[in-house]
């Protein structure tokens, strides 16, 4: 039996639109949660007056259980369909969700966007403050080409499986997504009830007017991601554990290249070198790991305090690039006034987040064509596109988008909001001493 290809899935959408309920119910329907466990959770939810949250509780309980032991990242959120093995990155519902959404999205092969069809809720998600808009923008920046849209809460009394409301929601989303450059004709918009289960796995008798795929069918229609095995090895570190018997175990997703047991790897920016003793994915030992694999790998010669989230592992002959400065094409999404030289947002790139100062605004661009419309403008405001130079305040690994896109796209955050998005066009490398032992 050939092994099923692996896909990383991120679930996005506005708060309370049903992300956790959708994932919890899907896992239950696919047989990943025992009836007994569900009953137990239902009782707990009822006793706290939160009966409608029972499926969401599945995720929260799993998260708590996960946080009690060292389960190497997100093992519980794994499920299989006929065609794929899916890992759900970052179960939704985080206070810090956008930050996680950025690092999570940078590792995702596809996304499910959950959108409530309810009047008021849908509109809130699409408002300028809305996370439906923000998450779609971020998914686009982070290079997620494949999206499935779940139009949720079709069972709500004020929606009542109404085809017209579904069509209205879809038309608004299509217009917005088209503006972001998505090929909307290739995107499934599935009317679902995460709570009742309509169109998750079986076709819903409540919506005979819909003849597209169910959620699970749409998941199986996704295209497998291309594996950039020929590029230099890059593994952005998500977490670092110290595990008895194994030693220091960084966890992350292989973005490019191949990691093998016995390889010497260097972690940048710190420049520490270690030897790979073992590689593990979903509790299974591997001899090698390829792009898309979420792994833990034990390294000899590196202590837990040497490395942290945001560092990047690579091979010694082609180490990850630490930027003294970098040039980028950015698009300003939101800012209360104007962005000038000296502005210092937090740059979220792969798993790193580092404040970086704008040291030059080289040119303002036409956002649609990319043509230069003004050299050395004094300031930038919302809606502007530009070429700027950044200087990271602390050491930071970035790569040219044209060479390693996974490490070359970023979001700019400030005041708890996404201020802009960008791609790295050039890097002035910093000198780093590699501390080979």
Swiss-Prot record:
Residues 69-73 are annotated as: G2. Residues 152-155 are annotated as: G4. It catalyses: GTP + H2O = GDP + phosphate + H(+). One of its GO terms (cellular component) is cytoplasm. Signal peptide: none annotated. Keywords: Cytoplasm, Elongation factor, GTP-binding, Hydrolase, Magnesium, Metal-binding, Nucleotide-binding, Protein biosynthesis. It is found in: Cytoplasm. Coiled coil: none annotated. CDD domains: EF1_alpha, EF1_alpha_II, EF1_alpha_III. Residues 4-229 form the tr-type G domain. It holds the Pfam family GTP_EFTU_D2. Residues 90-93 are annotated as: G3. GTP binds at residues 13-20, 90-94, 152-155. PROSITE patterns: G_TR_1 (PS00301), G_TR_2 (PS51722). SUPFAM superfamilies: EF-Tu/eEF-1alpha/eIF2-gamma C-terminal domain, P-loop containing nucleoside triphosphate hydrolases, Translation proteins. Residues 13-20 are annotated as: G1. Its EC number is 3.6.5.3. It is an enzyme of class 3 (hydrolase). Mg(2+) binds at residue 20. Residues 193-195 are annotated as: G5. GO terms for molecular function: GTP binding; GTPase activity; translation elongation factor activity. PANTHER family: TRANSLATION FACTOR (PTHR23115). Belongs to the TRAFAC class translation factor GTPase superfamily. Classic translation factor GTPase family. EF-Tu/EF-1A subfamily. GTP hydrolase that promotes the GTP-dependent binding of aminoacyl-tRNA to the A-site of ribosomes during protein biosynthesis. This is Elongation factor 1-alpha.
């Amino acid at each position: 039996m050939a092994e099923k290809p692996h896909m990383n899935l991120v679930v996005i959408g506005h708060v309370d639109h049903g992300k956790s309920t959708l994932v919890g119910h899907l896992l239950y329907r696919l047989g990943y949660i025992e009836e007994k466990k569900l009953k137990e959770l239902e009782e707990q939810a009822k006793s706290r007056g939160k009966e409608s949250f029972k499926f969401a509780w599945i995720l929260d309980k799993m998260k708590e259980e996960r946080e009690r032991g060292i389960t190497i990242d997100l093992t519980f959120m794994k499920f299989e369909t006929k065609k794929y093995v899916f890992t759900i990155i970052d179960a939704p519902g985080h206070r810090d969700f956008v930050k996680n959404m950025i690092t999570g999205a940078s590792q995702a092969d596809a996304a499910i966007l959950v959108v409530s069809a309810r009047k008021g809720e849908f509109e809130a998600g699409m408002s300028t403050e809305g996370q439906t808009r923000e998450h779609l923008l971020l998914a686009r920046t982070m290079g997620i080409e494949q999206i499935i849209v779940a139009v949720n809460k079709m069972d709500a009394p004020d929606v009542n499986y109404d085809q017209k409301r579904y069509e209205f929601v879809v038309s608004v989303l299509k217009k917005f997504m088209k503006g972001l450059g998505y090929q909307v004709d290739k995107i499934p918009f599935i009317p679902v009830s995460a709570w009742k289960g309509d169109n998750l796995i079986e076709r819903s008798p409540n919506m005979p007017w819909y003849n597209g795929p169910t959620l699970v069918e749409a998941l199986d229609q996704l295209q497998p991601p291309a594996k950039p095995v020929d590029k230099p090895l890059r593994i952005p570190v998500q977490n670092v554990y110290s595990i008895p018997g194994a030693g220091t175990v960084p966890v992350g997703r292989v973005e490019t290249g191949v990691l093998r047991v016995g390889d010497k790897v260097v972690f940048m920016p710190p420049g520490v070198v270690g030897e790979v003793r073992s590689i593990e994915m979903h509790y299974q030992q591997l001899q090698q790991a390829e792009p898309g694999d979420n792994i833990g790998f034990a390294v000899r010669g590196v202590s837990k305090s040497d490395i942290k989230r945001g560092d990047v592992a690579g091979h010694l002959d082609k180490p990850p690039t630490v930027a003294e400065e970098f040039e980028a094409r950015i698009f300003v999404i939101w800012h209360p006034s104007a962005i000038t030289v000296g502005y210092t947002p937090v740059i979220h790139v792969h798993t790193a987040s580092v404040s970086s100062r704008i040291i030059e605004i080289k040119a303002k661009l036409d956002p649609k064509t990319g043509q230069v419309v003004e050299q050395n403008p004094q300031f930038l405001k919302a809606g502007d596109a530009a070429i700027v130079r950044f200087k990271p305040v602390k050491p930071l690994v970035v790569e040219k988008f044209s060479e390693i896109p996974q490490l070359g796209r970023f979001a700019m955050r400030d005041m708890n909001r996404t201020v802009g998005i960008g791609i790295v066009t050039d890097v002035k490398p910093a000198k780093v001493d590699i501390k080979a032992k």
